[in-house]
Amino acid sequence: MIAVEDRVRRALERGHRVDITTTGRTTGAPRRIELVFHNIDGRIYISGRPGFRRSWIANLNADRHMTFHLKGPVVTADLPAIGRVITDRAERERVLAPIAAGWGYEPALMVASSPLVEVTFPD
């Protein structure tokens, strides 16, 4: 039987739908939302369509701690995580280029207005 850690690692190797739970910046209440994550060069990122403001980004700017909920099909797991909102233009261009290509968006549009968060998992 495969260890849970191996299944989690394998699930993180490819992008899929995921939920994250953040802490509401004004209410302090947990806020859960479904998103898509990407594995780019071994790092985990969350992004979204361009052109919309997101409360989950504001929540992460206030408190970087979140729960990263893997929802299958390989494994289900609730992972404590840290989110780093990426604002550096060069880093955004590098990370968003393959996401934009996969989604059929103009890279410059995504760099200008898509959310982008790097997710790390504390030991």
Q: Language-model features: where?
A:
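Extreme N-terminal tail/first-helix region
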Residues: 1-17
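A generic structural micro-feature
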Residues: 12, 27-29, 60, 111
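A generic local structural motif
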Residues: 4-7, 32-33, 104
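Short beta-strand segments
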Residues: 15-49, 66
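Short, structured beta-strand-loop surface elements
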Residues: 51-123
